[in-house]
Structures are given as structure tokens and as C-alpha cells.
């Protein structure tokens, strides 16, 4: 198995690619399959979120480029800047990872959030697109709280310790 242990900023060439969802790009320990079918494992420093185009490397210089997978997302649109800002405010108030662009925002599909935004007057469509949420108000990579990832031989299990003061649940 290929063990990807480093995050790089630039390389002369890429040896392979891997397509990962947003949730997978938040993991520092994860078993993955490269686009060419090779088994690999992420053994990365904690606290980093991978993005489309991130470059990973083994200790011996084998380089893998991350591709953001298309996944089910909701995209909310409005030509009204005030209405759009209100929609983004309500999503942020619920700690929803959010990709914000001019006139539209995107989040992992949730019909309850869709209905809330439609009720506010935004147009919402469910799509299969790459999802690149904002890093957060403080530029942090973990969305305001931390998740401890414990490595085991299968690279598939993760502990779930929290370091924050507000209750919510996560599904894994």
C-alpha cells in the first residue's frame, strides 16, 4: 500500500490522482484507492483540509494530486444581495460548511436546510458538483473544533473526541 505522508505546495510532475469527497478531504487517516486502482493510505499531519489540487507525497517522492469528487449538494441562489446574505447568515448560524460565490452558495444536501432557504425566498437546486467550503472565520482548517483521528492498521477507524463548547452530533 502507498502511504501518503506529506502535503506539498508544488511539484514538477504528478504520478497519480485520487478523487475525494469533502468529508474524505478532512481526514488525516484514511484508506483510499487511487484513480489507477492502487491502494493507498492517508497518514497526514492533523488539522489540514485537502482541497481540489492539493498535492500529497510518499516519503520516497511518489506524488498524488487530489481531485474534488462530485457529490450531492444543494446550491442556493439569489439576485438580491440582502436576501442572499440572510440565507448565508442562517446557514452559518447552524455551523453548516458553506462554499460562497457571487450570487450563490453551496452546502452538503439537506432537505431541511433547502426548505428553510426556499422559505426565505432563495432558489435551491440539488446537484452533483464538487464542494469546496470556506476555511472558516479564523482561517483554521478544522471548522472551529477538532476531531482526533486515531490510526490503526486498516486506516479505516477514527476516534471521535471533541474540543468545543456547543452540542451537536456528527455521523460517521
Swiss-Prot record:
InterPro entries documented for this protein: UreE, UreE_C_dom, UreE_N, UreE_N_sf
Main location: cytoplasm
One BP term from GO: protein-containing complex assembly
Signal peptide: none
Example of a GO cellular component annotation carried by this entry: cytoplasm
One GO MF term attached to the UniProt entry: nickel cation binding
SMART domains associated with the record: UreE_N
UniProt keyword terms in alphabetical order: Chaperone, Cytoplasm, Nickel
Location(s) in or outside the cell: Cytoplasm
Entry's family note: Belongs to the UreE family.
Record NCBIfam families: PRK13261.1-1
Its job: Involved in urease metallocenter assembly. Binds nickel. Probably functions as a nickel donor during metallocenter assembly.
Protein's name according to its UniProt entry: Urease accessory protein UreE
Protein source organism: Shewanella halifaxensis (strain HAW-EB4)
Encoding gene per record: ureE
